[in-house]
Amino acid sequence: MPMSAETTSLPAALPIALDAAGGDHGVTPNVEGAVQAARAGVPVLLVGPRVALHAELGKHAGSASLPLTVVDAPDVIGMDEHASDVRSRSGASINVCTQLVKEGKAAAAVSMGHSGATMASALLTLGRLKGVDRPAILTHLPSKKGFVTLLDVGANADVKPVYLAQWARLATVYLQVVEGVQDPTVGLLSIGEEDHKGSQLVLAAHALLRELDGHSIHFYGNVEGRDILQGTTDIVVTDGFTGNVVLKLAEGEAKVLFGWVREALGSRLQTKIGALLVRGALRGLAERMDPSTYGASILLGVRGLTLIGHGSADARAVKNALLRASRAYEAKLIERLEAALTPQDG
């Protein structure tokens, strides 16, 4: 069935640290999304400029009684600044978020702000899981069978074959413990289904994934671009450059298609009447294809939960990101990943 962060709202033992001024629209959607998540039972630490956050909270009736706490961090790394700024700005809001996770005061760090800064902060503050050379950004796309998991979608443009094998293992555990997929299948993105097709990277990665098949992963084989949204496999692994292109292409195509549908249904009286009849179905389809339904992408491979959202995120996306972080924490994702990566004796 289609996955949605909105379907489950588990209370976390620890609050989620939200980079509450990050993103294109500042504190407004972040605070509104946090209020919605708090009403669903998820406690949130709002990390950012104290005065602005309290002023925004004041616009939401009843927010004072919700599990929301403001953590003052007036320094915010802007979308047009350098990711490397996290090294010299220890008090930046995203650094405060990841530090709270490291100290065990927050279950996860969530940011709709500078994605590069978020990745850099997570790596510098939390470090990598043992057995992981490079973390990857994992996201979900709607598919014919519900949703498909795609990684990497931007953390690593240049990769080695072993990275893809590691990411397949990480994504397998993620789907098992967070999304409840019992035996997720892994596909390797290539230009043909045949084992001998693909770049040198794909050929080498294919051999590694085949070795893991039946042990830590269920390897389907190569998949092509057309297979992704068909849901041929539960997981598709690729390098971050290709994955990011696939993600942006899918998002852009969805917008174009819905634009065409709106134009077609609104062009004549008969079609306007027909539009009223199919409005419910179209609304459900639009929700499945809306990135805000999935909230945020997870940075897999660091020693602490870190979720990265769109800079243009609205309140719904923020809420769903917080709910997803809560689910991952309750599922003990980091502990399960560490266990899966630990060599077994015998």
From Swiss-Prot:
Its EC number is 2.3.1.274. GO terms for biological process: fatty acid biosynthetic process; phospholipid biosynthetic process. GO terms for molecular function: phosphate:acyl-[acyl carrier protein] acyltransferase activity. The keyword Chloroplast does not apply. SUPFAM superfamilies: Isocitrate/Isopropylmalate dehydrogenase-like. One of its GO terms (cellular component) is cytoplasm. It comes from the Bacteria. It catalyses: a fatty acyl-[ACP] + phosphate = an acyl phosphate + holo-[ACP]. Coiled coil: none annotated. It is found in: Cytoplasm. Keywords: Cytoplasm, Lipid biosynthesis, Lipid metabolism, Phospholipid biosynthesis, Phospholipid metabolism, Transferase. Pathway: Lipid metabolism; phospholipid metabolism. Homodimer. Probably interacts with PlsY. NCBIfam families: plsX (TIGR00182). Catalyzes the reversible formation of acyl-phosphate (acyl-PO(4)) from acyl-[acyl-carrier-protein] (acyl-ACP). This enzyme utilizes acyl-ACP as fatty acyl donor, but not acyl-CoA. Belongs to the PlsX family. This is Phosphate acyltransferase. It comes from Deinococcus geothermalis (strain DSM 11300 / CIP 105573 / AG-3a).
